Amino acid sequence: MTCAEPGCAGVVEDGYCVVCGTAPAAATSAGAPAESSVTAATATAGDGRCAEPDCGGTISDGYCDTCGTAPGPPATATVTTAAAPISKATASTRSSVRTGRSSSSKSSARGHLGAGMVDVPRVPRVDPVSAIMADPQVAESKRFCGKCERPVGRSRDGQPGRAEGFCPHCGTRFSFAPKLSRGDLVGGQYEVAGCLAHGGLGWIYLATDRNVGNRWVVLKGLLNSGDVDAMAAAVAERRFLAEVEHPSIVKILNFVEHLGSDGVAVGYIVMEYVGGTSLKQILRDRREPDGGSLPPAQAIAYILEMLPALGYLHSLGLAYCDFKPDNVMQTDEQLKLIDLGAVISMDDESSAIYGTVGYQAPEIAHTGPTVATEVYTVGRTLAVLTMRVPQRDGHFGELPGPDTEPLLATHDSLYRLLLRATDPDPEARFASMEELADQLTGVLREVLAAEDGRPRPGMSAFFGPPRAVFGVGGAVLPADVVAALPVPLIDPGDTGAALLATTAGTSPAELEPAFEAGLRAVVTGRAESMEIPLRLVRAALEVGDPEDAIRRIDLLAETIPGDWRLSWYRAQALLLRRDFPGCYTEFETVYRALPGEPAPKLALAAVAELATAATDGQDRGVGDAGRATGFYDTVWRTDRGFVSAVFGLARLHGMGGRREDAVTALDQVEPASALYTEARIAAVDAILAGRGPTTLNEAVLREAGNRVQRLAIDSKRRGAQVRMRVLEAALSWLEAGGAPGDDAPLLEVGLDREGVRTGLERCYRDLAREAGDMWTRIELVDRANAVRPRTTL
């Protein structure tokens, strides 16, 4: 039976699709459209019958009396798969006040993860029977008392430790032996096949559901029935997870109790069986041959696939708490969170908090679970997947730095993202999974572009496109950089957003009265809008008044302290002042907050280049040509829409004597670009730059000439300028004794003194006719007369 889910080519086995995991829709009458298989599997029939495949039970007290499944929303309801962040004190105001528009929170199409950009290796579906442990035992090194947490069940005097007994320190009973055996029937419905694993809350069993087509299910029992916290966690799990419906989260089917051989009732969570491989095992398989880690793009794709699921839990007021590679399972190309034992309400101030040392946020014991603590676990997990994180006392320690981890030296944006995600200050971390996904997607684009050289442009949720291009055909000027940099997107929810869209003006003097008049016509007051004062800051920068801009920024800082937009605009004001160190520091603040965005990298590159030029390359602090080159290269390699970056890259290559690299970069500008011709002209300049008569040769001259010949230059003045550049170089070479190897023309004139002089005379006279003032015209005519070939009558 083929899967009826749109876009899925899988087949249904054991009641579920082997590709997307969806149950088949209930049969419909001829000619009637089939409902979505997701809603059909969870909806309730109109007469109260359970709609679970192969189940004939009825819904009683909110659950099926046969299979135990809770009914889902009506068939017409839409299951939400992405969530907005919850409103809680963890939202950061220090580095990110708003999220803006997001383009990365949607689930990617199957076959490609990481916003559809990464094709990860498929993991075959594991035969459930093959996953059963032959000899289920808990290693002695992992046996600890559930109450005092001291070692129990250890070997002594050559005798193996006991799997069951009483703690010698506090007297609490412990049991690490499986409580269920093959063939046991739990809850009168689930037949045990064997043990799969031992987790933090006890043994996990494989079983078949005898009431629903013998489908495979997983039973998770408690570590110790006498452990009050563990029992409470199981009960809480059932309560919370009854409402959880997400394609990337394991489905909780039921909660049952079973009377053990000791007469004690033990609770079990019944979950869907996810047959695949955990990320922990995938990482282990990768490390066994050569000690390597997962490719960064693959690891990022895994994380991106799970962020919507975590965000969904947050929208319900729940925290996952124990995100780590062990708890993410890949089957084929689908990922799922498989262990929800640590899930807790963010408002729960009394329940025990479960997690794993090395992944868990350091402040969670004091703050409880928050979005910030969740972000921390994601950052730690990404680090463990991509690099060797040092261990201390058997747990992962501090993250390595670029000086010891080559991956971080290669991908600085990834390093910055990890630093923010795991910042010791919770308020400095990403404010939501959506915001983290936005930045991680940007980092992924950079990583992929660095790996194969193919650009991966993307829509920013924080910035608009570049407004102009700076540094084309001349030196970089601070005012040109400010005029070209992207502008932060306006928050559509701001009270002044509509007014900004309808108000014209350029200077603060023009805009302020218009804003005052507009705000008087609406109910909301000016003090409620942050976008209007930010627009006035930008207006001050656009008219070249950094002092007014800084004054306005200082006033705003009292209302929205730490907002990255203030640093963005303050940096531009300092740039107009030519305060390069201060400017660089402010742009660096934006980069730390938004490591996946190209805009702050472009700004940092421009400032580093300007500082290098201002200090003749002697300042190795801000004025670092190598740093500027790296930023320009990253931006251009990732997104060809930032054309300023390629001109900056070419300038710095030229300054370093790397002519071929400069030309190669400029040749990457596509013919469809408005700057295509300027890039080709700049390439000609790069070929000839710094060459005297002794370092020129015929091949260089002909390459430059052929490039000019192929250009379609609309401007007569611009065409004359670039021809003049080549012919002047040719004349200096000829007059230094250069001799061409053949009589082929150069730019339609002979490559000899008379031909080149004739061509130069024509260039000077063309430029004179296009000159805007008399003195320039006179100078060009004089140069034409001086270079014209001498003739004798």
Each model region followed by its residue ranges:
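Protein kinase catalytic-loop region centered on the HRD/HxD motif
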Residues: M306-L318
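Regulatory extensions appended to serine/threonine kinase catalytic cores
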Residues: A450-L536
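Conserved short submotifs of the Hanks-type protein kinase catalytic core
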Residues: D262-S278, I282
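Activation segment signature within eukaryotic-like protein kinase domains
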Residues: Y302-I303
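Protein kinase glycine-rich loop
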Residues: V192-G200, I204
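Short beta-strand micro-motifs within the conserved protein kinase catalytic domain, predominantly
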Residues: K251-G267
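Glycine-rich ATP phosphate-binding loop
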Residues: Y205-A207, G213-N224
